[in-house]
From Swiss-Prot:
Pathway: Amino-acid biosynthesis; L-lysine biosynthesis via DAP pathway; DL-2,6-diaminopimelate from LL-2,6-diaminopimelate: step 1/1
Binding site for substrate: N13, Q51, N71, G81, N82, N166, N200, E218, R219, G228, T229
Gene: dapF
PANTHER family the UniProt entry points to: DIAMINOPIMELATE EPIMERASE (PTHR31689:SF0), DIAMINOPIMELATE EPIMERASE, CHLOROPLASTIC (PTHR31689)
Catalysed reactions listed for this entry: (2S,6S)-2,6-diaminopimelate = meso-2,6-diaminopimelate
Name the UniProt record assigns to this protein: Diaminopimelate epimerase
Subcellular location: Cytoplasm
Main subcellular location of this protein, as a coarse class: cytoplasm
Pfam families on file: DAP_epimerase
InterPro entries: DAP_epimerase_AS, DAP_epimerase_DapF
Source organism of this protein record: Caulobacter vibrioides (strain NA1000 / CB15N) (Caulobacter crescentus)
Active site: C80 (proton donor), C227 (proton acceptor)
Lineage summary: Bacteria, Pseudomonadati, Pseudomonadota, Alphaproteobacteria, Caulobacterales
Keyword line: Amino-acid biosynthesis, Cytoplasm, Isomerase, Lysine biosynthesis
Single biological process term from Gene Ontology: lysine biosynthetic process via diaminopimelate
PROSITE patterns referenced in this protein's UniProt entry, alphabetically: DAP_EPIMERASE
């Protein structure tokens, strides 16, 4: 029997969402890659997405679901900010509620309705210790000894590292970078030996104390139109460096997220839109 999926996106960062309340979903990495592969000019390929998301029955009291994420390369992802908003919206729609909580491998997340297809999610506190990223060696994560390019004229250097349930490194740049720059530099840094689990790479331009321009090279997915945890990491990194206030607009080419690193409890709060694209059926070979 084929399985129904929902295609959703947050600022163009797109997902195949599979609800498993009545039928388990235990895909192989090959099946995830088959689903995520974007169709070519010949029409061959999968559905196409940055991440695959499974919404499972809850495993703990107080949660509406247990949620799993995979990157398009087939590897399990610890967290996904834009995907979290999409999941929160779906669960709220299903329950007829304005607030919801669900569990992930990275911990419990919660979301509240903030308007028409606008969702605010509590992403929890960031991980700032080198062991939480993780890094291969002890290091001050506010000023990491890393650079790309010639020693006397590096392209980017001295980034900040943050965990948002997944590892991020944020480079501050004097001007917004091009897609080609983000691809070339991001792909190099993603697999740097300093990051034993790989890393998401952000390039953040501080436009003002409440405005960041951002591009993100996602671990296992490549250059994406938007990255929710990347936006959270960029804002946390900027606050740590004294570059922005606690609340800022993080802008991608496709739109903006509002990110607040709340001083009262240290949690990162993200507000942004979701888009429901369509529903479909998985091909039999990848229905898992």
């Amino acid at each position: 029997m084929s399985r129904t999926f929902l295609k959703m996106n947050g600022l163009g960062n797109d997902f195949v969402v599979i609800q498993t309340l009545t039928e388990a979903f235990d895909p192989t990495p090959e099946q995830i890659r088959a689903i995520a592969k974007r169709p070519g000019v010949d029409g061959k390929g999968g559905i196409g997405c940055d991440q695959v998301i499974a919404i499972d029955p809850p495993r703990a009291e107080g949660a509406s679901a247990y949620v799993r994420f995979w990157n398009s390369d087939g590897e399990v992802a610890g967290a996904c900010g834009n995907g979290t908003r999409c999941v929160a919206w779906l669960l709220m729609q299903s329950a007829g509620k304005d607030a919801v909580a669900f569990d992930t491998v990275a911990g419990r997340l919660s979301g509240v309705a903030a308007g028409d297809k606008l969702v605010t999610v509590d992403m929890g506190p960031p991980g700032l210790d080198w062991t939480q990223i993780p890094l291969a060696e002890e290091m001050n994560t506010e000023r990491v000894e890393l650079q790309v390019g010639p020693i006397d004229a590096p392209l980017v250097h001295t980034p900040v590292c943050v965990s948002m349930g997944n590892p991020h490194v944020v480079f501050f740049v004097d001007a917004p970078v091009t897609d080609d720059f983000a691809r070339g530099t991001g792909s190099l840094v993603e697999h740097h030996p300093l990051f034993p689990e790989g890393v998401n790479v952000g390039f953040a331009h501080i436009a003002s104390r409440d405005h960041i321009r951002l591009k993100v090279w996602e671990r296992g997915a490549g250059l994406t139109q938007a990255c929710g945890t990347g936006a959270c990491a960029a804002q946390v990194a900027a606050v740590r460096r004294g570059l922005t206030d606690r609340k800022a607009r993080v802008e991608f080419d496709t739109g903006s997220l509002t990110i607040e690193w709340r001083e009262s409890d240290g949690h990162v709060i993200m507000t942004g839109p979701i888009t429901m694209e369509y529903a479909g059926k998985l091909p039999e070979l990848v229905a898992a």
